[in-house]
């Protein structure tokens, strides 16, 4: 990736995290490239959040109940992202649920199958997200939907901040671990300020509590 172009980093991130039919990136995934791609993940979140908010807005003008709209948004985001985060959540919870030593946890997480703990986590996370989307749709909190999805993706940046080592010595995690500056924590604060400014112009004004609650939910389960 020449000069770590932000545009190229976003291109790689979109290709990696979504099913959007962009040209296949031709880059060498070294540590510098991987770090730039991780930094671009919240931009993908902004794209996904905009799609989710626009879909919620359109569906809110139909006869569909908001609960069903929430479910459709969760399913839609899972399809757009290849279910990558859903699969990762299941692997993580299955690993933690085995109550074994670190080696056993890593083995379970790499198995590729979904166990009872992982299945329960998927159902619980999907239900929480659907209820959250439904509540925000019912109150016409379109900016909060975008904000929540963006901050949910920003969790990946925080997980790769300096000072945190990789779980394994090989793989993509080893490439990107510790590549993000700690100062990047200011971005969620900027996003919150931006959401407050934009949300104030929406119907009924802006309620920071909704954005914070929604963002917290998506950071935990996205």
Positions of PLM-derived features:
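Cytosolic, membrane-interface loops and tails of multi-pass inner-membrane proteins
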Residues: 2-3, 7-37, 93-108, 160-179
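Membrane-helix interfacial "entry" motifs
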Residues: 29-33, 37, 41, 62, ...
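Alpha-helical transmembrane segments and their lipid-water interface positions
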Residues: 19, 85, 94, 119-122, ...
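C-terminal membrane-associated helical module and adjoining short loops/tails
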Residues: 1-6, 165-222
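Membrane-embedded alpha-helical segments that form the functional core of polytopic membrane enzymes
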Residues: 38-93, 143-148, 206-222
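Membrane-water interface at transmembrane helix exits
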Residues: 56-60, 81, 85, 133-137, ...
């Amino acid at each position: 990736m020449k000069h770590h172009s932000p545009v190229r980093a976003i291109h790689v991130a979109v290709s990696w995290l979504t099913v959007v039919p962009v040209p296949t990136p031709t880059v060498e995934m070294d540590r510098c490239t991987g770090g730039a791609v991780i930094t671009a993940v919240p931009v993908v979140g902004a794209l996904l959040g905009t799609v989710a908010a626009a879909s919620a807005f359109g569906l809110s003008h139909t006869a569909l109940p908001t609960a069903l709209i929430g479910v459709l948004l969760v399913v839609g985001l899972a399809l757009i992202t290849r279910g990558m985060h859903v699969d990762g959540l299941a692997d993580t919870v299955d690993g933690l649920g085995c109550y074994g030593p670190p080696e056993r946890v890593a083995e379970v997480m790499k198995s590729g199958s979904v166990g009872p703990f992982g299945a329960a986590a998927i159902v619980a996370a999907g239900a929480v997200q659907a209820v959250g989307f439904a509540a925000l749709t019912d109150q016409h909190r379109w900016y909060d939907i975008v904000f929540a999805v963006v901050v949910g993706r920003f969790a990946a940046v925080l997980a790769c901040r300096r000072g945190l080592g990789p779980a394994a010595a090989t793989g993509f995690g080893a490439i990107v671990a510790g590549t993000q500056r700690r100062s990047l924590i200011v971005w969620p604060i900027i996003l919150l300020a931006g959401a407050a400014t934009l949300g104030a112009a929406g119907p009924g004004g802006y309620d920071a509590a909704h954005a914070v609650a929604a963002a917290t939910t998506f950071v935990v389960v996205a």
